[in-house]
Structures are given as C-alpha cells and as structure tokens.
Amino acid sequence: MSVQHVYEITVIGGGPVGMFAAFYAGLRQADVLLLESLDELGGQTGNLYPDKILYDIGGFPHVSGKDLVTQLKTQLVHFHPEVKTATEVQTIDQDPDGFFTLHTSQGDFRSKTVIVATGGGAFTPRKLAVDYDPALEGKKLFYFVQDLETFRDQEVAVAGGGDSAIDWALALEPVAKHVSLIHRRAKFRGLEASVAALEKSSVTIQTPYLIESVTPQDDQLAIKLKEVRGEAQPTLTVDKLLINYGFVTDKHHLQAWQLDTDRNGILVDTQMQTSRPGIFAIGDAVSYAGKLPLIASGFGEAPTAINEALSRLYPDRRQALHSTQLYH
C-alpha cells in the first residue's frame, strides 16, 4: 500500500495479543494493518518459548507457545488483514487531519487510529552474574529453551525462582534425565498451583543458594553453589544449565512515540486510551491499577481498545454485537 492509503486501525506488535487485536478488528470489518518488528509473528511466546506450556489461556487445559501462535495465525487470516513483518516503527506523527503517519524501517504508513501491542519491548536476558566462558552459551549454558529435545536424557540445572523457572523445571522433568532447581531464596515466587506441582515432582530443589562459579568439567559443567547466610558450598555436575533470571527490557521506542509511561509501561485509561488521543495500548505494554501481565488479560483488553477506536471514528455507528452474531 502507498502512503496515501489510510488504514482505519494499525496494530503495532505481532505477539498473541496483537494478533488477536487484528483479528477482532477484522471481526468489526475494520481496515487493518498489523506491523511486527521480528521476521515472524508470535512475539516472545512463539519465538523464544515455542515449547513452553501455558495453563492460563481460556479454552485450553494446556497449550504450548507454538500451538497457541498457530491457532492465532489461523484465526487471524480469516479476515485477510495486511501484515508486515520485519517492520520497526520508529516514530508516529499526527497529521493535520488528525490521523497518523507511522514512520517505519519499511516506509511510511497512514492510519486513523493506532493500537500498541508491543509487550515488554525489546528484551535481553539477565545474565548470570559470574564470569564464565561465553562459548558455553547455546551449548551448555542457555537463557532460552527453543527445543525441549536439546535437553533429552541430560542432567539439567535450572536457576531462578519465578514462574518461568518453575515452569521450565516442570516441563523438563519428563524429558531430562534429572532436573535440579536453584533459587537464592527459601520460597518461590510462582503461581501456587505451579509451586504445588513442583513440590510433588522429582525435581531436586536447591535453596537457598547462589551460583558462585560455572566451569567446564570434561563434557559437563561444574556449578559451585554458596548457601545464602550459611557455610555450605556444594557442587552440582550437570550437562546443561538454564538461567531464568528474567529480562532487561528496552522501551526507548515509547519515548520516540511520545507516550506517557510509568515504570511499568504505557499509561492508559479504562478504554485503553493513551496520552495521545487516537493511540491505544494493550497487553504487557500497558500500566494501570490492577494490571496483570497475562496473555489472557491482553485478550480482554483488545476488544475494549478496538471498539473504542471505532467509536471514535464512527460515533453514530452501532457498536459491537456478541461475536456469535458477527462471525460466520
């Protein structure tokens, strides 16, 4: 499309929440553009954690990241939205007519409204805070799991105390020869059901310990631990070490887009409206009282933002009916 074409809604971000937002906009018969900075749709869920099992998605007792993304892609294409990957939005200007020009790495696009669904922004994993040979990364030491088979029949240690660390320890349990979970505190920060499952599992819990050193030993890793407020210094010998210390996010693009933020994300009101009228935000990108960083929450925010955007464009148009009345 040329710069002269004006989309009704442009969704920035092709993760699960962005894909669902683009689908729902199609359900409302809107002219939609979906922009994604990565080469593939799916966000962190599809690109970093394809084998991670999700338990908090409505309608799925459990579903892997890659299977959820596959289902969302199937849903998305029903209304044939315009989708552009490998497209980074650099700035968003408001034009004299009140609409927006999005300046991107692949040219300019015009849109009447914008929905930001960029998740946590660009991200890098928090690294292990001890010196180690960088050549170990991707061979013996990992920050992401892209294929569970990499860990099959291996002695595996997982480091971390949040939901991701617990989830990966449980996911690896039936695949690996044995799994140990290392955490610096006595208690874990995960969901109660996950912690209960961990306690019933065969995973060896190593708490409260810090990792003091990681050194190659023959074809394995020797992980020296240090007890927090104690004297014990055991050593674990494993085939692979998975670090789950969270991520450092880069949200510089939010400043370039001139959106008001706090330490948690983009500030929005109850209609998901940002500080710039006509630009909305949903999913893990946003901040409001009571916000939960769940895909399920983002799925609920998407229709709110889309319907408000269309109400802004067409105040006299009948608003959304139940989806069963719309989708055939």
From Swiss-Prot:
One of its GO terms (molecular function) is flavin adenine dinucleotide binding. Belongs to the ferredoxin--NADP reductase type 2 family. Homodimer. SUPFAM superfamilies: FAD/NAD(P)-binding domain. Its EC number is 1.18.1.2. Its cofactor is FAD. It is an enzyme of class 1 (oxidoreductase). FAD binds at E36, Q44, Y49, V89, F123, D284, T324. This is Ferredoxin--NADP reductase. Binds 1 FAD per subunit. HAMAP family: FENR2.
